[in-house]
Swiss-Prot record:
It is linked to Branchiooculofacial syndrome: A syndrome characterized by growth retardation, bilateral branchial sinus defects with hemangiomatous, scarred skin, cleft lip with or without cleft palate, pseudocleft of the upper lip, nasolacrimal duct obstruction, low set ears with posterior rotation, a malformed, asymmetrical nose with a broad bridge and flattened tip, conductive or sensorineural deafness, ocular and renal anomalies. It is found in: Nucleus. Its main location: nucleus. This is Transcription factor AP-2-alpha. Sequence-specific DNA-binding protein that interacts with inducible viral and cellular enhancer elements to regulate transcription of selected genes. AP-2 factors bind to the consensus sequence 5'-GCCNNNGGC-3' and activate genes involved in a large spectrum of important biological functions including proper eye, face, body wall, limb and neural tube development. They also suppress a number of genes including MCAM/MUC18, C/EBP alpha and MYC. AP-2-alpha is the only AP-2 protein required for early morphogenesis of the lens vesicle. GO terms for molecular function: chromatin binding; DNA binding; DNA-binding transcription activator activity, RNA polymerase II-specific; DNA-binding transcription factor activity, RNA polymerase II-specific; DNA-binding transcription repressor activity, RNA polymerase II-specific; identical protein binding; RNA polymerase II cis-regulatory region sequence-specific DNA binding; RNA polymerase II transcription regulatory region sequence-specific DNA binding. Residues 14-107, 414-437 are annotated as: Disordered.
Length: 437
């Protein structure tokens, strides 16, 4: 047994020595080839046409072109700071085109020896182009060339809209008339606007035609009356100076509120040739007179004039005021003042009597000059025909007071001079009566 064990040990020792002598020499070349493979096959630090293998990128340390500020929020308090990245003062601004090219060339020299494809990985190029757009007009003009085509529509949309003063198409027109006349210079600008030919022709039907009948607002239940509203009156409510919308016009015409009341009213107006756009805003302030149709407004003015003529206490007011000025030395002066005031009131009422503002279904020919007539027409349109008759009624009440004041002064003069001859009094009274007329 011991002999067999010693033989086995010797046999294994021989095999180990044989492997060491035979394989030891063979391992050295293999180790040499394995050790040399990563160094001999490494590419040089330059661009190679091999596109399958890209060496790892280890950028060398560099100094930033734009030094960061210590306080990242230092630019917030200063509204005139050009750039938060330019916190430190520099002799020259890096945002100009010439300097930018020199900086880009210097930046390429710092990355010399690297692959050409890696030069676009520098994130500072994007920041530099962004900074060029934030500075003055010169940098802005140079930076516009770097904008992409996709950003152009957004830049165009931000341009403020400038209206062409040559195109003057009033949006308050309520009558559908012929096509709008445009000049040659403006025809190209409006050629792209879609125009409905059906809305360009036609016009308002007979202005004297009755549009609807409206019950009065101010009448009592026992004497309720209805007023006829013509097409011309509806046109005046939709035209300046009021420019009523569908809601207010429906209130004037006493139309019941409904879900589609505005649309039905616009359709009804469209049938007679009047245009009432949706979403329209009123142009004048709403008063109590706005709710009255012209027939009721004129009726109110006529009743007001009747009350002023018959019920105004002109005589009592004249006697009361004359007693406050009973000094005989002031009577002559006061009488002349009353006569002059009466003459001025007469001139004023004569002017209002010549007013020919359109009212109801009548459109009389103007008598006054266009300047003063347009002002009176504006007043009557705002008041729905109540204005001028009401003013005339008030001035008539004033004239009645002046007449009663002159009569009272004559009585006071006769009472203060009882020795005067009756003939002289009669002659003076006749002259005064002629002057009053």
């Amino acid at each position: 047994m011991l002999w067999k064990l010693t033989d086995n040990i010797k046999y294994e020792d021989c095999e180990d020595r044989h492997d060491g002598t035979s394989n030891g020499t063979a391992r050295l070349p293999q180790l040499g080839t394995v050790g040399q493979s990563p160094y001999t096959s490494a590419p040089p630090l330059s661009h190679t046409p091999n596109a399958d293998f890209q060496p790892p990128y280890f950028p060398p340390p560099y100094q930033p072109i734009y030094p960061q500020s210590q306080d990242p929020y230092s630019h917030v308090n200063d509204p005139y700071s050009l750039n938060p990245l330019h916190a430190q003062p520099q002799p020259q601004h890096p945002g100009w085109p010439g300097q930018r090219q020199s900086q880009e060339s210097g930046l390429l020299h710092t990355h010399r020896g690297l692959p050409h494809q890696l030069s676009g990985l520098d994130p500072r190029r994007d920041y530099r182009r962004h900074e060029d757009l934030l500075h003055g007009p010169h940098a802005l003009s140079s930076g516009l060339g770097d904008l992409s085509i996709h950003s152009l529509p957004h830049a165009i949309e931000e341009v403020p809209h400038v209206e062409d003063p040559g195109i003057n198409i009033p949006d308050q027109t309520v009558i559908k008339k012929g096509p709008v006349s445009l000049s040659k210079s403006n025809s190209n600008a409006v050629s792209a606007i879609p125009i409905n030919k059906d809305n360009l022709f036609g016009g308002v039907v007979n202005p004297n035609e009755v549009f609807c009948s409206v019950p009065g607002r101010l009448s009592l239940l026992s004497s309720t009356s209805k007023y006829k509203v013509t097409v011309a009156e509806v046109q005046r409510r939709l035209s300046p100076p009021e420019c009523l919308n569908a809601s207010l016009l429906g209130g004037v015409l006493r139309r019941a509120k409904s879900k589609n009341g505005g649309r039905s009213l616009r359709e009804k107006l469209d049938k007679i040739g009047l245009n009432l756009p949706a979403g329209r805003r009123k142009a004048a302030n709403v008063t109590l007179l706005t709710s009255l149709v012209e027939g009721e407004a004129v009726h109110l003015a006529r009743d007001f004039g009747y009350v002023c003529e018959t019920e105004f206490p002109a005589k009592a007011v004249a006697e009361f005021l004359n007693r406050q000025h009973s000094d005989p030395n002031e009577q002559v002066t006061r009488k002349n003042m009353l006569l002059a005031t009466k003459q001025i009131c007469k001139e004023f009422t004569d002017l209002l009597a010549q007013d020919r503002s359109p009212l109801g279904n009548s459109r009389p020919n103007p008598i006054l000059e266009p300047g003063i007539q347009s002002c009176l027409t504006h007043f009557n349109l705002i008041s729905h025909g109540f204005g001028s008759p009401a003013v005339c009624a008030a001035v008539t009440a004033l004239q009645n007071y002046l007449t009663e004041a002159l009569k009272a002064m004559d009585k006071m003069y006769l009472s203060n001079n009882p020795n005067s001859h009756t003939d002289n009094n009669a002659k003076s009274s006749d002259k005064e009566e002629k002057h009053r007329k």
